[in-house]
Amino acid sequence: MEVLQLWSDRVVLEITERSEVGANFSWEGALERVKAMGFQIAVDDLGSGYAALNMLAELQPHFMKVDMSIVRNVDKDEHKRRLVDLLCSFAEATDSEVVAEGVETDEEAAALADAGVDLMQGYLYGEPSLTLTA
């Protein structure tokens, strides 16, 4: 870490909900080591796979990144809105933060903010870039 001039408390390791690991893999041991080094954990693409609740229980992430399939039209879809409300309540109860991915409209952003989403990313805020900025 020192050679790369990285501060572990500024690095978030994203584990996608769709990640496949071997049957003998233990998240617990690996995550204890990663967290002990000061890294933070995020579950990415939450809502796009099949084991979301199991992953949340095992990983105890610092961040929950809601997949854009749930974010899209959240301002017009009451079921999606209720799901985001529940995720925000769960995140608050577990000291996690909710990140909404793929936010494209002001209306989506407003609905997500009203639900309690902590952070948002998407084309509404800027296009993806290969350039690193601090």
What are these regions, as identified by a protein language model?
Residues 14-23, 39-134:
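EAL-family c-di-GMP phosphodiesterase catalytic domain
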Residues 1-12, 37, 92-94:
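Helix C-cap/alpha-to-beta connector motif
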Residues 26-29:
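Signal-transducing alpha-helical linker
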